[in-house]
From Swiss-Prot:
It comes from Gallus gallus (Chicken). This is Ovoinhibitor. The record marks 157-158 as: Reactive bond 2 for trypsin. Residues 67-132, 133-197, 198-263, 264-329, 330-394, 395-460, 461-517 form the Kazal-like domain. GO terms for molecular function: ion channel inhibitor activity; peptidase inhibitor activity; potassium channel inhibitor activity; protease binding; serine-type endopeptidase inhibitor activity. The lineage of its organism: Eukaryota, Metazoa, Chordata, Craniata, Vertebrata. CDD domains: KAZAL_FS, KAZAL_PSTI.
Length: 517
């Protein structure tokens, strides 16, 4: 006969006692049905035992009991310290095992250490990390609405955080339902409560590196796209990207998780701001003139949270707040080697296609396509990078318009009452306004977000820099097409034609964009 050792965790019995029963060998059975089949013939024999045996009888006859593999803890040195705490000398080799408590341990000795420290009886379930047990959520109780082919779920504003299988924390279970409906995913619930932040270290020793002449450490990374999310909240192409960033910037970014970073977006309570309807039925939101910049999910900086509410009400959009503060400016370097270029009369010429795919440069100028931006850099010897695709959107520097009185007209429009005092300011669009108040009035009337570049007239603007080589009208211009849009609404075929017009206008013409008007 073989003794069967019962490590019990429940009941009023002594938790440190092992109860030994003479039974036939009980193999490890992973499936509930098999466990029930083995337990059944033993149940009748055990019913005649003493009272404490009934605990074992109950545990055996439950089909869902966790049968684990007992770890041989005698292999590891152990003892009790001077302070009375137990210790186990565990090796530092990483051989993850999953315990019967659902926790992953670095190796089998980790289970021994845990049991000794906590007086527990955890056993090994299987080798390797514990596999998360996903819980499918019943989304039928939540109202679903289909608009323009998109399914939206109406969720209650109840904060009961749950962790999704994508390692993202949702406000409640309905949040997972809403995300799945909106993005056509199948995310399930891992557990109640917020997701635990599991930070993984990256082994950078496997990537070759070199030190440049200026003392910078450069890491040679493979061109493999396997996105990882760093602890700084940025997504890197692969783990090596984190290594390269740390070496170059002297930082200590670790890997937060595999896959792209997902940003938790705080909700804005737009009900706190007063609204009114115009005669045309449009909803207007009255916002306080407080400058607390926030970044929207559309990549645009708003004066404050109310600005997002007003934008959504006016345009029927669903922009949310990405984060407090201005949107971060990110740039993308361009590969200009793919475009043909040569030099004529000392001027670099780039052959660009007649394709309108507007891009915004880091200099705040809109270019007709990537090639036009390359041509600009070649001609002027600059290093302008691509900020983003599409036309540039003006970000708002600090401009305090709250000191100017406003009034609301009968049609619902708000206007600013400005004095006739001439105190010119230069705006971020390169235009001179009669005063700061006039600039505020322009923003309110035109729904723009122009900022103040400086006090005084715009003297050293983009146009002056762009045409600095043209002291007089050039009699000959080349025929390449690199469109320039002037403030007069005219599209000029290239820099030469635009700058000639700039000189002829007594240098009052401004460059609006490097694209067709």
């Amino acid at each position: 006969m073989t003794d069967w050792v019962l490590h019990h965790k429940v009941g009023p019995l002594d938790m440190t006692t092992r109860y030994i029963f003479p039974l036939l060998p009980l193999p490890f059975l992973p499936h509930s049905e098999s466990k029930r089949a083995v337990c059944a013939p033993r149940c009748s024999a055990m019913r005649t035992a003493r009272q404490f045996v009934q605990v074992a009888l109950a545990l055996c006859c439950f089909a869902d009991i966790a049968f684990g593999i007992e770890v041989n803890c005698s292999l590891y040195a152990s003892g009790i310290g001077k302070d009375g705490t137990s210790w186990v000398a565990c090796p530092r080799n990483l051989k993850p095992v999953c315990g019967t408590d659902g926790s992953t341990y670095s190796n089998e000795c980790g289970i021994c250490l845990y049991n000794r420290e906590h007086g527990a009886n955890v056993e090994k379930e299987y080798d390797g990390e514990c596999r998360p047990k996903h819980v499918t959520i019943d989304c039928s109780p939540y109202l679903q609405v289909v608009r323009d082919g998109n399914t939206m779920v109406a969720c209650p504003r109840i904060l009961k955080p749950v962790c999704g299988s994508d390692s993202f924390t949702y406000d409640n279970e309905c949040g997972i339902c809403a995300y799945n409906a909106e993005h056509h995913t199948n995310i399930s619930k891992l557990h109640d409560g917020e997701c635990k932040l599991e930070i993984g270290s990256v082994d950078c020793s496997k990537y070759p590196s070199t030190v440049s002449k200026d003392g910078r450490t450069l890491v040679a990374c493979p061109r493999i796209l396997s996105p990882v999310c760093g602890t700084d909240g940025f997504t890197y192409d692969n783990e090596c990207g984190i290594c390269a960033h740390n070496a170059e910037q002297r930082t200590h970014v670790s890997k937060k998780h595999d896959g792209k970073c997902r940003q938790e977006i705080p909700e804005i309570d737009c009900d706190q701001y007063p609204t009114r309807k115009t005669t045309g039925g449009k909803l207007l939101v009255r916002c306080p003139r407080i400058l607390l910049p926030v970044c929207g999910t559309d990549g645009f900086t708003y004066d404050n949270e109310c600005g997002i509410c007003a934008h959504n009400a006016q345009h029927g959009t669903e922009v949310k707040k990405s984060h407090d503060g201005r949107c971060k400016e990110r740039s993308t370097p361009l590969d200009c080697t793919q475009y043909l270029s040569n030099t004529q009369n000392g001027e670099a010429i780039t052959a660009c296609p007649f394709i309108l795919q507007e891009v915004c440069g880091t200099d705040g100028v809109t270019y007709s396509n990537d090639c036009s931006l390359c041509a600009h850099n070649i001609e002027l010897g600059t290093s302008v990078a691509k900020k983003h695709d599409g036309r540039c959107r003006e970000e708002v520097p600090e401009l305090d318009c709250s000191k100017y009185k406003t009034s609301t007209l009968k049609d619902g429009r708000q206007v600013v009452a400005c004095t006739m005092i001439y105190d010119p300011v230069c705006a971020t669009n390169g235009v001179t306004y009669a005063s700061e108040c006039t600039l505020c009035a322009h923003n309110l009337e035109q729904r723009t977000n122009l900022g103040k570049r400086k006090n005084g007239r715009c003297e050293e603007d983009i146009t002056k820099e762009h045409c600095r080589e043209f002291q007089k009208v050039s009699p000959i211009c080349t025929m390449e097409y690199v469109p320039h849009c002037g403030s007069d609404g005219v599209t000029y075929s290239n820099r030469c034609f635009f700058c000639n017009a700039y000189v002829q206008s007594n240098r009052t013409l401004n460059l609006v964009s490097m694209a067709a008007c």
